[in-house]
């Protein structure tokens, strides 16, 4: 497995007057430092987890929900999918001293940024996924800003758990292009799953019925199960067998 995609784009945030890290799609970051984690979201979702007792937190940024993930894929590819991105974030916080039962979540994103996206609304799927995942993990969502049509800029302070969101104009340089590429990728994955289902159906077709093999049933004496023992003396089968032996 390749190295996990930990965000490395560090900077100093003049607005919040503290060090910051900018997260790109597929990345995550965990820390106990008093800093700000920043990301821009379209249909993608960012989950921000915080342990108020330990004073640690983290953020991820995933592009698609759990379907389509290849268990054999490298970590850099799997981080695109919500199931893997959430698992990594939770595990890394636990390694740093957090406790799952204390985690609180704030979730953002899942917008329908591309006009006319009706057949595949990636944002809705991502939003539904993160809610279901956290419910199954019994992690409480304390704040959310999901779905809608506007991209978002999210700032999260992992030490305090404070989060802020800013709605952006519809056409943000880089976001629209990324969303179009993501829609094409979702189409490709859906087509691949359809092909796999067709191949699986073809492979499982029942074989053509074979003609029944002729059977000779042997009747034994009283108390003997059908098919067991030798033919009884005096039976037609025994008489025929005796004549063949004499010949």
Swiss-Prot record:
UniProt entry tagged with the keyword Hydrolase: yes
Enzymatic reactions: L-glutaminyl-[protein] + H2O = L-glutamyl-[protein] + NH4(+)
Highest taxon in the source lineage: Bacteria
Keywords: Chemotaxis, Hydrolase
Coiled-coil blocks: none
Composition bias, Low complexity: 227-239
InterPro entries: CheD-like_sf (IPR038592), Chemorcpt_Glu_NH3ase_CheD (IPR005659), Cytotoxic_necrot_fac-like_cat (IPR011324)
PANTHER family associated with the record: CHEMORECEPTOR GLUTAMINE DEAMIDASE CHED-RELATED
Family according to the record: Belongs to the CheD family.
Function per UniProt: Probably deamidates glutamine residues to glutamate on methyl-accepting chemotaxis receptors (MCPs), playing an important role in chemotaxis.
Name of the protein in its database record: Probable chemoreceptor glutamine deamidase CheD
Naturally occurring in which organism (per UniProt): Burkholderia orbicola (strain AU 1054)
Species lineage: Bacteria, Pseudomonadati, Pseudomonadota, Betaproteobacteria, Burkholderiales
Gene, per the UniProt record: cheD
């Amino acid at each position: 497995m390749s190295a996990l995609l930990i965000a490395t784009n560090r900077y100093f945030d003049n607005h919040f007057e503290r060090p910051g890290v900018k997260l790109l799609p597929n990345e995550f970051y965990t820390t106990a430092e008093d800093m700000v984690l920043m990301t821009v979201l379209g249909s993608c979702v960012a989950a921000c987890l915080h342990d108020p007792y330990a004073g640690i937190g983290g953020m991820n940024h995933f592009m698609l929900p759990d379907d389509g993930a290849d268990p054999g894929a490298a970590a850099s590819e799997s981080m695109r999918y919500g199931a893997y991105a959430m698992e990594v974030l939770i595990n890394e916080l636990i390694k740093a001293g957090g406790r799952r039962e204390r985690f609180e979540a704030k979730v953002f994103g899942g917008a329908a940024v591309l006009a006319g996206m009706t057949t595949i609304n990636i944002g809705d799927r991502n939003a539904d996924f993160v809610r279901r995942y956290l419910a199954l993990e019994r992690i409480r969502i304390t704040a959310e800003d999901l779905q809608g049509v506007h991209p978002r800029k999210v700032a999260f302070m992992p030490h305090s758990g404070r989060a802020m969101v800013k709605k952006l104009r519809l056409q943000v340089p880089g976001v629209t292009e990324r969303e179009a590429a993501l829609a094409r990728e979702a189409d490709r994955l859906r087509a691949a799953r359809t092909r796999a289902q067709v191949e699986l159906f073809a492979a499982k077709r029942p074989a053509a019925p074979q003609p029944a093999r002729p059977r000779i049933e042997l009747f034994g004496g009283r108390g003997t199960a059908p098919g067991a023992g030798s033919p009884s003396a005096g039976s037609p089968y025994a008489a025929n067998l005796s004549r063949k032996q004499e010949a």
